[in-house]
Amino acid sequence: MSFFQENWLLILVAFVSGAMLVWPLVQKRFSPMKELGTLGVTHLVNHQDALLLDVRETKEYEGGRLPNAVHVPLSQLEARAGELARHAARPVIAYCATGARSRMAGAALAKAGFKDIYNLNGGIRAWKDAGLPVEKATT
């Protein structure tokens, strides 16, 4: 018992460290989104007519996008979810610059009734790093 009393801070740090290691796994398990790499994205687009959803802000979008992507910034996603309703039966692949904002988009898409939701792991940066095509947005 004296070990625990003398080393309570060390035990607390060990517990918190362990929780921080496990948390991403728990979060991923209960997320409405599935993660995909660039190969998985190209497969879904080519074989299942997946919708590419760019959730970056307009300035970022204007710098380049994935071919045929639909642009709805994350900040407007809940308000504009009705515009995407006609695509609810299709797989939806959300992406942003690195994959962080598109993960947040998953909850809004699930709330809007989408069932088959994916995140491009690494975002458009991973797409470009893989040498895949990017097109300039038309204004």
Predicted regions: what is each one?
Residues M1-G40, L44-A50, T58-P91, S102-T139:
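Rhodanese-like catalytic fold shared by cysteine-dependent sulfurtransferases
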Residues D54, G99:
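Conserved G/P- and acidic residue-centered "switch" motifs that form tight phosphate/ATP-binding loops
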Residues C96:
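Short cysteine clusters
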